[in-house]
């Protein structure tokens, strides 16, 4: 028997992929791929393939920028390739 912890991430990813593409879906995917610390330190909006990330300060901005290639790859896996074409990160 396959453990649930091995099947669940794939099942959730499949459900997310099949849901209609909305800004809320992209925001949910963001929280899922970056984890609780970055999710809590940022807010996002999405449109025209651009994910706009508002970080609460410069250190979080740098962290997101540093991790942007990995974040994009994970977003591509959840949302489909090129849904997020660019991540624009700014700080308050």
Regions found by a protein language model. Give the residues of each.
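Short amphipathic beta-strand starts and helix->beta connectors
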Residues: 35-40
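A short interface-forming secondary-structure element
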Residues: 48-68, 90
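N-terminal presequence-like segments and adjacent domain-start helices
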Residues: 1-32, 43-48, 69, 79-92
């Amino acid at each position: 028997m396959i453990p649930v912890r091995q099947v669940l991430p794939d099942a959730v990813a499949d459900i997310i992929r099949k849901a209609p593409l909305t800004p809320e879906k992209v925001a949910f995917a963001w929280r899922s791929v970056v984890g609780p610390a970055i999710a809590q330190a940022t807010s996002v909006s999405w449109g025209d393939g651009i994910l706009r990330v508002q970080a609460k300060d410069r250190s979080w901005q740098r962290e997101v920028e540093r991790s942007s290639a990995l974040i994009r790859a994970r977003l591509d896996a959840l949302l489909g390739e090129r849904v997020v074409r660019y991540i624009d990160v700014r700080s308050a």
